[in-house]
Amino acid sequence: MKIPTRKQMARLAAIVGAIALVAVTATTSSTAAPRTHTGFAKIRLAFSTWNGYAGLVIGVKSGMFKKAGLDVQYSVIEDPVERFNALKAGSLDAIATTPDTFARTYARGIKTVQVLGLDASVGGDGIVADKKITNVKQLKGQKVAVSAGSTSQWFLAYVLSVNHLSLKDVKQVDLTSGDAGAAFAAGRVPVAVTWQPWLDRTKKNPNGHVLVSSKQYPTIITDQVGFTPSFIKDHPETVQAFVKAYGAVIDYTKSNPDKAFGYATKYLGQPVSAIKATLKEVPLWTLRQSRAYYGTSAKHGQIYAIFTKAGQFWKTIGEISSVPSPNGAIDPSFLTKA
């Protein structure tokens, strides 16, 4: 199955880049967090169009969040800049995105605390190369098409680092991830960092192959939910209830995939069969998997190292001036208690 990318999914939205606000109750323009009848604060959450966020939509549309006493409203905001600006302005309480994105924005003063893992890219992203290039170390000196400042560039930097190389060792050609795949297919570059469907297309290319994919690095590109520090401070019981309820949503989804994903077809613009087919490359995490990724405050999970490495990467290319500490940006306690 050719899994749609975040950008491809955005094109399927009715209005690309616009805010499509969906609420369990009526939308409020207030920046406060009103209480529900259970005493929990309303949660205003934003994310882009992506299969890994289906569980959040299912939680709202199925009524499972509401049944848990939660009032969750979500906004689909494709542009990450708009998303974080809304968070900074106080119009949102939480955002779902990747740890590398959280690291960059945290260092720029838009602070969030990651509390819950949603999914991982397990083969949905990768590096394609000429068949003559058989290992990562042979990328040294090669032209590599990659989108500057993107998660794809972060993935490249990470793969190079574990093979004792850096971005300085390759000649980067700045192209979007989709265009990078097309450039490789056309023979204009010997290497490209891209995603599906270009990875599958490369497998059919007699002159190319998938050198490495996120299947070999399943903890690098993941999605998390991060709340503002003030929301966590003022409403810890709401965050705890949200994490617990999300776990129940995923358990329900795994037991009843046809019915559960039926709630997400409009959001994703895909039929249930297509959504289910993407699960091999974008598996939705259970709370158990999320706990393993986060670890505890005493014994950190992999997310801490990923966050730090991402921060180091952004600093190296001049996107941020200092590397943020993961200790204030990650809180595993809600998962521990869920």
Per-segment meaning from a language model:
Residues W50, E78-V81, A96, V146, ...:
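Soluble non-cytosolic domains of exported or imported proteins
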Residues A33-D174, P190-Q196, V212, T219:
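Short, glycine-/small- and polar/acidic-enriched structural segments
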Residues D234-T316:
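Secondary-structure end/capping motifs
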Residues F307-A338:
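Conserved C-terminal helix/tail region of periplasmic/extracytoplasmic solute-binding proteins
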Residues D93, D100-T101, Q172-V173, G178-G269:
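Pocket-lining segment of extracytoplasmic ligand-binding domains
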Residues L167-V170, G269-E281, S321-G328:
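Short, surface-exposed acidic
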Residues M1-F40, A338:
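Short, low-complexity disordered leader/linker segments with a strong preference
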